[in-house]
């Protein structure tokens, strides 16, 4: 924590998640954004992309302007701008950035992300799943974080939606096995028109014109943050032509018999208790755009789910895959700092 009493953070990669993490940070009193790094866009372009957002609207909290090529002004607040390609070259230490949000989508394993430490950062939070960095989902397993960990992953937006819901169901009723489908909005890696995609040919098709089946490791990743569910969940994804907000369909076989009403009551109770602000509950007749800007990880849609019988049920939960996830990145940093 800096001399201001705020946690000083830097952001590497000013894409969708990087910019929204910045927006979340700039609205909080306990976080100070001190630097951003992106070698692929100018400071002027970076400013425009931050200020105007097709999904989340114009930034109105304070004026954003370019002071010079290496400095942004958010109101009176100076934020350093770097353009380094390699993480080890970014001078985080010079600006006092203790925590770095690694949101390029490139440096997602421990060794690559650890390069930020050479520039003076103390901790790195990867805003993506990682094959070898410990993964934390706030509301599920963040209590397992130990202060000697320097590189961690905030998992994926879908895992952040699925894990709190799966935890409640497993804690209350037990999960024998389950399948997840996420109906997921467009992301930056998709194509605007049909084009080549070496590993995933379907993924190369036009994002705004197709429903695209895709793979996801989000359900299996729940087994990493909740080991009791390891091997019990898997899933797939449909990419659909919406700009933001996604929805998880979790179909599970229960150990203990429970009516759908009992399941709803359990989720509602947790959403108002230990998981308040993480897991939501609604009985309204909602659609996807109703959740744009919702900071919760997972909002259970009580009317959308259905039970076949007392041991086999389909549960539906919404999430703003951009804003909700970015909010958890900051929450994880705050938790890490509190255990330092």
UniProtKB/Swiss-Prot annotation:
The record places the site described as Activates thiol group during catalysis at 184
List UniProt keywords, sorted A-Z.
Cytoplasm, Glycolysis, NAD, Oxidoreductase
| Cellular component GO terms, alphabetical | cytosol
Which cysteine pairs are covalently linked by disulfides here?
none
Q: Report the locations given in the UniProt record.
A: Cytoplasm
Q: In which pathway does it act?
A: Carbohydrate degradation; glycolysis; pyruvate from D-glyceraldehyde 3-phosphate: step 1/5
Return the InterPro entries for the record: GlycerAld/Erythrose_P_DH, GlycerAld_3-P_DH_AS, GlycerAld_3-P_DH_cat, GlycerAld_3-P_DH_NAD(P)-bd, Glyceraldehyde-3-P_DH_1, NAD(P)-bd_dom_sf
Catalytic reaction annotation: D-glyceraldehyde 3-phosphate + phosphate + NAD(+) = (2R)-3-phospho-glyceroyl phosphate + NADH + H(+)
Q: How does it assemble?
A: Homotetramer.
Q: What is this protein called?
A: Glyceraldehyde-3-phosphate dehydrogenase, cytosolic
């Amino acid at each position: 924590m800096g001399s201001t009493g705020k946690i000083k953070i830097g952001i590497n990669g000013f894409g969708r998640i990087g910019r929204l993490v910045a927006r979340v940070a700039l609205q909080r009193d306990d976080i100070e954004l001190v630097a951003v790094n992106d070698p692929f866009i100018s400071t002027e372009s970076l400013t425009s992309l931050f200020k105007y957002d097709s999904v989340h609207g114009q930034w109105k909290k304070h004026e954003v302007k370019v002071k010079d090529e290496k400095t942004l002004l958010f109101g009176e607040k100076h934020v350093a701008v770097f353009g380094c390609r390699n993480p080890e070259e970014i001078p985080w230490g010079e600006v006092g950035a203790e925590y770095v949000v690694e949101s390029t989508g490139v440096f997602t394993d421990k060794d690559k992300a650890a390069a930020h430490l050479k520039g003076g950062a103390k901790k790195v939070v990867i805003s993506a799943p990682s094959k070898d960095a410990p993964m934390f989902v706030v509301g599920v397993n963040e209590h397992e974080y130990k202060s000697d960990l320097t590189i961690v992953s905030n998992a994926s937006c879908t895992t952040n939606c699925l894990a709190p819901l799966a935890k409640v169901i497993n804690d209350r009723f037990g999960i024998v096995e389950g399948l997840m489908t996420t109906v997921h909005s467009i992301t930056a890696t998709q194509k605007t028109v049909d084009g080549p995609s070496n590993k995933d040919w379907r993924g190369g098709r036009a994002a705004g014109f197709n429903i695209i089946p895709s793979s996801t490791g989000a359900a299996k990743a729940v087994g990493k943050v909740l080991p009791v569910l390891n091997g019990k969940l898997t899933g797939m994804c449909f990419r659909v032509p919406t700009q933001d907000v996604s929805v998880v369909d979790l179909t599970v076989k229960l150990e203990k018999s429970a009516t759908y009403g009992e399941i709803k009551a359990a989720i509602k109770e947790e959403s108002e208790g230990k998981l308040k602000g993480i897991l939501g509950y609604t009985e309204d007749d909602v659609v996807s755009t109703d959740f744009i800007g919702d900071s919760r990880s997972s909002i259970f849609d009580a009317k959308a789910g259905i039970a076949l019988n007392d041991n086999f049920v389909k549960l539906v939960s919404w999430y703003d895959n951009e804003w909700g996830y970015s909010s958890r990145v900051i929450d994880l940093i705050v938790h890490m700092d509190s255990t330092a």
